UniProtKB/Swiss-Prot annotation:
This is Desmoglein-1-beta. Desmoglein repeat repeats lie at residues 835-861, 862-891, 892-921, 922-949, 950-978. It comes from Mus musculus (Mouse). The lineage of its organism: Eukaryota, Metazoa, Chordata, Craniata, Vertebrata. The gene is Dsg1b. One of its GO terms (cellular component) is cytoplasm. Residues 24-49 form a propeptide.
Length: 1060
């Protein structure tokens, strides 16, 4: 548009406005008077309208009082008369009340409160102008007040989660769902314009969906949806008003999209081929399991498979049954297979789904054949009649034994006539026919009579059985004979007496009742014979009656013995003989008791065995076997009257265990020889020689016992080892269980010794004594210091009666001299030797400080007087050796005894590790003249032993130690004080010799003598000593204490002082 035309248009518009405002129209209206028929003209003049100020718009959610007055009304009538203005409507006199008010004089309308556009989009105010009488001067005026919208409401989705679904492999841009969201702000306004956007997708591999930002429609982005990969997608969609502007409000919602399955996966079999084997003539309901793999949704028609035969099953031998729950097909055999006809079958099978394939893969589907190789296994089938029925013709001219025909069974394996079967007649009406058991030739038993012909009604039907004994199988063939011709000879029912159907003839029914047994089967019939082989019986012709005067035949049984001894019976018989042959072997191996000392046998369980000394003679668990003593060599006894004692002493047999004893009276008279097995210690069968002498004998190492006393060598070894163990253990622990004596005030009282009393409570705990049995009563009395009769009179009933068998004792007179001991019993000395090497593996004791210095040793001895000596007490080796009681008896000297003794010990360097063992021994008439202790092996551990024997007169004893042992580290001191009745004097000497030097051995010798009536005693002790270290433990066991030793008392001293 050019400028000239615009000027013309603006001029015309201005002229129109002026004309419209300033022009005045005058209209005349004719008024017809109907009464007089005149017409009157009225002149109507158009006047200028009164001016009204329009109402201003109000903004919601704000205070609009600053815009008051929002409107003003005015009537032209106010120029002539007073006018009152009033308003009404919503927000004034209708809810919500009081939003608008008016000035009745001026007509100004004001707003007084905040308004909400979503509640009231606009207000209509009805305005009126009234005069003084309340009459309307003007027509009511409608004044509209619009509420301006602000963006105060976010979008709202109609659902929290939108559900949708779509098929897999769908085309791109396929609609999936449409979202719906609303905004409460003013419609068709920017505040209510919503824009949609997908902000998140799960799984988030690649975006699959798009959304229309205006309409909210969700569509597929491509055609790659695959249910087998992801069956469900989750989207989060955001809706924002103001068309998605940054200043808009937003809301979010979820979308769940399910991918529907389609048949887009071709099924296939788990295996590419199958090989199966089946026996011929066998039917299988589950020959092989064929599993189908399909990736489509399970249990749907897209997943369910159908397996079908492509080729190879032309004879319909097989069927495939599908399991819809597992998608597994079962191949079944429904018709038997014949190995002779087909040895192998090649089946070709295919698979497809119940549902049709999807259009996306229908062009890709190709039928794939899976081969199933069936191997038919040959079995021994036996025989069968082919054909199963034969018909022959017999006329009246055929005599007995006439050949009717041949009915032979065919071997299914070879297709030829069977040669290993036998034939028998099954159902044989009138007993008419006979069959050869080998050839199967059928002949007439007798000539057919008229009566038989009439009963058979001109036709014979019977059965032939083919029996294979090796396979236990039977087949049946049917024989049909047509009786033709005339001239049947009359007869008295010949041959029918033994017929299978000629049993008890019923005159009422004109039938036959009887039983027939052929082979292993029994056939019972009524009015005919029915064979178990499948043959048919023929009843008599109805209406044909038998003569009433004919005698009734008795029931009959035709039985053929077919009993044979099978392989199972032979096997059971052989097994029975084997079991019977095994019984003597079991009786030999069964240990029902053994000879005494023979090893095997039942051992009696000792009573109250808790706390007993076990068979291995030490406390604690059973020790490992030592290589030191593996065998016991028992020397043969010398013949004649040789010195038995000397021979035994020099034999060099060392053992700590005994299993027998032999009692021998060497003074003349009788010899009592016995052999008693001691199972309690479990050693070899060497007897213990226990001697009781009435005279004076010389013996070096043989232990003495009275009436078969204790195994003293074993007891000494046991208690010595226990003493050493206690001493070693005591050296490694604090001295909280010893009486601490300090003679010098202020000396030897370390501050640390005060705290040892904290352990007294545990040491004084004697609650364990409540659980000890009666066997420990003697030990408890000893611990309490009670007076105990240590030497009771010998029991006249000893030895006790043993429940085990013993060798009989023999009594025979003795001549001069000593007879030899039977060599088969053997002899065993009682000398013990235990070697304990002091190597680096031995635990070293901690040294005990000597506060009094070296060489200051004092020994105090005290003696008490007593009456005459009491006999000694001996404890015999119990066979179980479970309870051992050791007693101690202290016997003092007689009044007037003068005891003298002297002990000289040079300075002992590191001589603090000293063990003093005291043994108190009571003498008897059976003491040997001398006691000899064998030299122990080289060791670094020594024992101090003190032996006191009751003196009767003066005793002089001295002990001297050579200066060479001044630097000895471990010293053994042995003192023996002996006495006897009527002694004139006692002299004892002790010598201690040693060689100074590293690794040398020291020697300690003590010799004690006693003179009395008929008693001479001498003793020597030789102990090896090694000065290798001062820290070695005491580990050497020293033999020879005393045969009557009752108890060993072990005391540990840090300093030993000796004085007279």
């Amino acid at each position: 548009m050019d400028w000239h035309s615009f000027r013309i248009a603006a001029l015309l518009l201005t002229s129109l406005v002026v004309l419209e405002v300033n022009s005045e129209f005058q209209i005349q209206v004719r008024d017809h008077n109907a009464k007089n028929g005149t017409i009157k003209w009225h002149s109507i003049r158009r006047q200028k309208r009164e001016w009204i100020k329009f109402a201003a718009a109000c903004r919601e959610g704000e205070d609009n009082s600053k815009r008051n007055p929002i409107a003003k009304i005015h009537s032209d009538c106010a120029a002539n008369q007073p006018v009152t203005y009033r308003i009404s409507g919503v927000g004034i006199d209708q809810p919500p009340y009081g939003i608008f008010i008016i000035n009745q004089k001026t007509g100004e309308i004001n707003i007084t409160s905040i308004v909400d556009r979503e509640v009231t989009p606009f207000f209509i105010i009805y305005c009126r102008a009234l005069n003084a009488q309340g009459q309307d001067l003007e027509n009511p005026l409608e004044l509209r007040v619009r509420v301006m919208d602000i963006n105060d409401n976010p979008p709202v989705f109609s659902m929290t989660t939108f559900l949708g679904q779509i098929e897999e492999n769908s085309n791109a841009n396929t609609l999936v769902m449409k979202l719906n969201a609303t905004d409460a702000d003013e419609p068709n306004n920017l505040n209510s314009m919503i824009a949609f956007k997908i902000i998140r997708q799960e799984p988030s591999d690649s975006p699959m969906f798009i959304i229309n930002r205006k309409t909210g429609e969700i569509r597929t982005m491509n055609n790659f949806l695959d249910r087998e990969q992801y069956s469900q997608y989750s989207l989060v969609v955001r809706g924002s008003d103001r068309d998605g502007g940054a200043d808009g409000m937003s809301a979010e919602s979820e979308c769940s999209i399910t991918i529907l399955d389609v048949n887009d996966n071709i099924p296939y079999l788990e295996q590419s081929s199958y090989d199966i084997e089946i026996e011929e003539n066998a039917l299988h309901s589950q020959l092989v399991q064929i599993r189908v793999i399909d990736l489509d949704e399970e249990f749907s028609d897209n997943w369910k498979a159908i397996i079908f035969f492509i080729s190879g099953n032309e004879g319909n031998w097989f069927e495939i049954e599908m399991n819809e729950r597992t998608n597994v097909g079962t191949l079944k055999v429904v018709k038997p297979l014949d190995y002779e006809a087909m040895k192998n079958l090649q089946l070709s099978i295919g698979v497809r789904n119940v549902a049709e394939f999807h259009q996306s893969i229908i062009s890709q589907y190709r039928l794939t054949a899976t081969m199933v190789t069936v191997t038919v296994l040959n079995v021994i089938e036996g025989s069968v009649f082919r054909p199963g029925s034969k018909t022959f013709v017999v006329d009246s001219r055929m005599e007995a034994n006439h050949r009717v025909g041949e009915f032979v069974a065919t071997d299914l394996d070879t297709g030829r006539a069977s040669t290993n079967v036998r034939y028998e007649m099954g159902n044989n009406p009138e007993n008419l026919l006979v069959v050869d058991s080998r050839t199967g030739i059928i002949t007439l038993r007798n000539r057919v009579t008229m009566e038989q012909y009439q009963r058979l009604n001109g036709e014979y039907k019977g059965t032939v059985l083919s029996i294979d004994d090796s396979l236990q199988r039977t087949c049946t063939g049917t024989i049909v004979i047509e009786l033709s011709g005339t001239g049947w000879v009359p007869g008295s029912d010949g041959g029918g007496s033994s017929s299978g159907s000629g049993g008890n003839r019923d005159p009422v029914t004109n039938g036959y009742q009887g039983t027939s047994t052929v082979g292993p089967q029994r056939v019972t019939g009524s009015g005919g014979v029915t064979s178990s082989g499948g043959g048919s019986g023929v009843n008599n012709t109805p209406g044909r009656q038998n003569p009433l005067d004919e005698p009734e035949p008795e029931p009959f049984d035709i039985t053929e013995d077919n009993v044979h001894f099978g392989p199972a019976g032979i096997g059971l018989l052989i097994m029975g003989f084997l079991v019977l042959g095994l019984v003597p072997f079991l009786l030999i191996c069964c240990d029902c008791g053994g000879a005494p000392g023979g090893g095997a046998g039942f051992e009696p369980v000792p009573e109250c065995s808790d706390g007993a000394i076990h068979t291995w003679a030490i406390e604690g668990p059973q020790p490992e076997p030592h290589d030191g003593i593996t065998t016991i060599c028992v020397p043969q006894m010398p013949p004649g009257n040789a010195n038995v004692i000397e021979y035994i002493d020099n034999s060099g047999v060392y053992t700590n265990e005994y299993c027998g004893r032999e009692m021998q009276d060497l003074g003349g008279g009788e010899r009592t020889t016995g052999f008693e097995l001691m199972d309690g210690v479990k050693t070899s069968a060497a007897p213990e020689i226990c001697q009781e002498y009435s005279g004076t004998l010389r013996r070096n190492s043989m232990r003495e016992c009275r009436d078969g006393g204790l195994n003293m060598n074993f007891m000494e070894s046991y208690f010595c080892q226990k003493a050493y163990a206690y001493a070693d253990e005591d050296e490694g622990r604090p001295s909280n269980d010893c009486l601490l004596i300090y003679d010098i005030e202020g000396v030897g009282s370390p501050a640390g010794s005060v705290g040892c009393c904290s352990f007294i409570g545990e040491d004084l705990d004697e609650s364990f004594l409540d659980t000890l049995g009666p066997k420990f009563k003697k030990l408890a009395d000893i611990s309490l210091g009670k007076e105990i009769d240590s030497y009771p009179d010998p029991d006249s009933s000893w030895p006790p009666q043993s429940t085990e068998p013993m060798c009989p004792q023999s009594t025979e007179p003795l001549g001069s001299g000593y007879p030899p001991i039977s060599p088969h019993f053997g002899t065993t000395t009682v000398i013990s030797e235990n070697a304990y090497p002091s190597g680096p593996g031995v635990q070293h004791p901690l040294p005990i400080p000597d506060p009094l210095g070296y060489g200051n040793v004092t020994v105090r001895e005290s003696y008490a007087t007593s009456g005459t000596l009491k006999p000694s007490v001996h404890f015999h080796d119990n066979q179980q050796a479970s309870n051992v009681v050791v007693t101690e008896r202290v016997v003092g000297p007689v009044p007037g005894a003068d005891l003298h003794g002297m002990l000289e010990i040079p300075d002992l360097r590191d001589g603090t590790n000293v063990i003093v063992t005291e043994r108190v021994i009571a003498p008897g008439s059976s003491l040997p003249t001398s006691l000899t202790i064998p030299n122990p092996r080289e060791t670094s551990n020594v024992v101090v032993t003190e032996r006191v024997i009751q003196p009767t007169s003066g005793m002089i004893g001295n002990l001297s130690m050579t200066p060479e042992l001044s630097s000895a580290q471990n010293v053994i001191v042995t003192e023996r004080v002996v006495s006897g009745a009527g002694m004139s004097g006692i002299a004892g000497t002790a010598g201690l010799g040693g060689v100074g030097g590293i690794g040398s051995s020291g020697l300690v010798s003590t010799t004690m003598g006693a003179a009395g009536t008929g008693l001479n005693m001498g003793g020597t002790a030789t102990i090896g000593h090694m000065r290798s270290s001062s820290d070695h433990h005491f580990s050497q066991t020293i033999g020879s204490a005393s045969p009557n030793m009752a108890r060993s008392r072990i005391t540990k001293y840090s300093t030993v002082q000796y004085s007279k």
